[in-house]
Amino acid sequence: MAIRQLMAGTLAAALLLSGCGSPRGGETGSAPADSASPQTQTTDTQKTDAAVQEEQTQPLAGVMICLDPGHGITSASTTERVSPLSQETKPAYVSGAEGEGQTEEELNLAVAELTRAQLEARGAQVVMTRQSHEATVSNQERARMANDAHVDLCIRIHADDAESGQPSGMSMQVPSGSLLGTPAIEQPSAQAAQIILQAVTQETGAQNRGLTPRSDLTGFNWSEVPCILLEMGFLSNTEENARLQTQEYRQKIAVGIADGVCQWKQSMESSQNRE
C-alpha cells in the first residue's frame, strides 16, 4: 500500500478513529438486481463478504513497517555524520540506559519482537534493524535499512532515563529542523506519532507526555520515510522500571503500537477518500 501518498490527512479526524481494520463503506460494484442473475448476485456477495473478512482479520495487509529496537551491545567507537546536510559527527553506536534488573537494549528488543508478532498477525510486513543483543548496524545504517526497504513507517523503540527518579510516562520524539535530509517526512511523522502514542498510552494506562521535536538524531536526519521514536517509560523510575520488566506490560505496549498503526492507516485512507 502506498501509505506515503496519503499523508495529507488532518490529525483531528485521525484521532476519532478507534477501530483496527473496520470495514469501509461504499459500493460493492455488483450489478443492479434487474440485470443480474441470482447466481451472479450470490457470487458477488460471496466476494464482498470475503473481502470484508480479510480486511477485518488482516487490516494491515500491504503495509510495511520497520521496527528499530534502539541500541545494542558493541565495542565499536566509530563516529558518523549526523546528517547528509552537515559534516558534524556523532557516535555511530550508543549503549543506552540501564535500570534495576534490565538494560534498555534488552527491553527494546523484547518489545520489538512482541510488536512484530502483533503487526504480522494483522497482515503487515515487518523489517527489523536488530534481532539479537549485538548492535551490528550504526544509527545511520538503521535509517538506510528502512529507506532501502521503502517502508511506510519506521518505529524506533527506546526507553527513557532521568537524573531524578520522579519522571514517568511515555513520549514520542519526531524529526524536525534544518538538518533533515528529507524535510517532507516531518509532518507525516508527527501525525503518525500522535495517533500511535495515544493508542499506546490508552492501552497501557501510562502518562502521555506528548511529542518532542528532535533535530540532532542521526536516525531521523538520514531517514527518507516517516519515522518516529517511542520512549516507553523511564528506567530511572523504580515503579515504571518494574512494570517494564513484566511480560504483561510489554505485551500491552506491543498491542498499543499495533492498534495505533491500524488507526494511522485508517486515517490515511479516510483522508484519501475525502479528496
What are the language-model segments listed below?
Residues 24-64:
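N-terminal, intrinsically disordered, polar/charged segments of Gram-positive cell-envelope systems
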Residues 71-74, 104, 132-136, 159-164, ...:
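Solvent-exposed loop/turn segments at secondary-structure junctions
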Residues 78-99, 162-189, 195:
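A short, glycine/acidic-enriched catalytic loop
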Residues 139-152, 217-223:
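Mature extracellular/periplasmic domains of secretome proteins
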Residues 156-164, 173, 208-275:
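Active-site-adjacent mobile loop/cap segments within catalytic or ligand-binding domains
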Residues 187-213:
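Active-site-adjacent substrate-binding region
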Residues 51-143, 176:
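Active-site histidine-acidic residue metal-binding/catalytic motifs
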Residues 16-19:
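C-terminal motif of bacterial Sec signal peptides marking the signal peptidase cleavage site
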